[in-house]
Regions:
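Flexible, processing/modification-adjacent segments and terminal tails
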Residues: 20-27, 31-32, 39, 91-159, ...
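Alpha-helix boundary/capping detector
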Residues: 52-57, 118, 177, 218, ...
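Bacterial N-terminal signal peptides
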Residues: 7-16
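Bacterial N-terminal signal peptides that target proteins for export
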Residues: 1-7
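Gly/Pro-enriched, hydrophobic low-complexity segments
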Residues: 81, 144-239
Length: 256
């Protein structure tokens, strides 16, 4: 009986403590947990390599190159073919040989949404006001049986991210994504773990993602190496010459 009372009091105290916290305080604690703003801002480029394991047991090699302020290029290599998706700061483009498309092509508004999130170099919580994002603290939740602090992040384009923070480390352990596309909602879940410091900044080395409520469709990316301030060239992200004329007639992707 006494043990149960102690546990109950502890839970109540924890609940009262976290209720007093604000979204701003949790964002600040998350940034500090990652290494602090100074160390985060000292990184200007990233080169990540890893392996992606999907349903059916297939394994692909993946890379992600990114540069400030909003350039990203991602590759997916399997069975001698390499797919590419990139954002040059204005337009998203891709090469998808797996579907028989060996030539570069522009990405549509719906397809480019995830790439735009990846292009946000520091993520949506850093300088969120300047980016036009809003953050709300929604209180406690449970992730795989463990307590978590839930933040709602509404992006400038209207999409919503729910971040679940570990109450001890304040690092993200889960992210739920809601994309609003032509009157419908597309939902995905991303689980983050195996954090390691690189140049003083914490990065997740295990990333499992897939459609919400479909765990069997999840894919797991295991990061093998992260190089910070890698010598990347802007030309790696630029729209191929064959697409530039068509892109000039399209609205800037950031405006969607």
């Amino acid at each position: 009986m006494r043990h149960r009372m102690i546990v109950l009091v502890a839970v109540c105290c924890l609940s009262l403590f976290t209720q007093c916290q604000t979204a701003e305080e949790l964002v600040d604690k998350n940034i500090q947990a990652k290494g602090g703003m100074e160390k985060i801002k000292a990184i200007h480029s990233l080169h990540m390599t890893g392996k992606l394991t999907g349903g059916g047991g297939f394994t692909a090699m993946v890379t992600q190159d990114s540069m400030r302020p909003n350039l990203v290029r991602e590759t997916f290599s399997l069975q001698g073919m390499t797919g590419v998706q990139a954002y040059d700061g204005a337009v998203g483009w891709q090469i998808q040989p797996f579907g028989g498309h060996k030539d570069p092509e522009l990405m549509g508004e719906d397809d480019v949404r995830g790439l735009l999130r990846d292009a946000d170099f520091d993520g949506p919580l850093v300088d969120y006001r300047e980016k036009g994002n809003t953050v709300e603290y929604l209180g406690h939740d449970v992730v795989d049986g463990d307590d978590a602090l839930r933040l709602k992040v509404t992006l400038k384009n209207g999409d919503i991210l729910y971040y679940y923070l570990d109450p001890d480390t304040y690092l993200e352990i889960r992210k739920e994504i809601q994309e609003f596309i032509r009157g419908s909602i597309r939902e995905n879940v991303v689980d983050l773990g195996s954090y390691k410091p690189v140049a003083g900044v914490m990065y997740p080395f295990s990333i499992a993602s897939g459609p919400k409520n479909r765990p069997n469709a999840a894919q797991t990316t295991t990061i093998e190496k992260i190089d910070v301030n890698a010598p990347l060239a802007k030309s790696e992200f630029e729209l191929p010459a064959s697409l530039r004329q068509g892109a000039s007639a399209k609205p800037d992707a950031e405006k969607h």
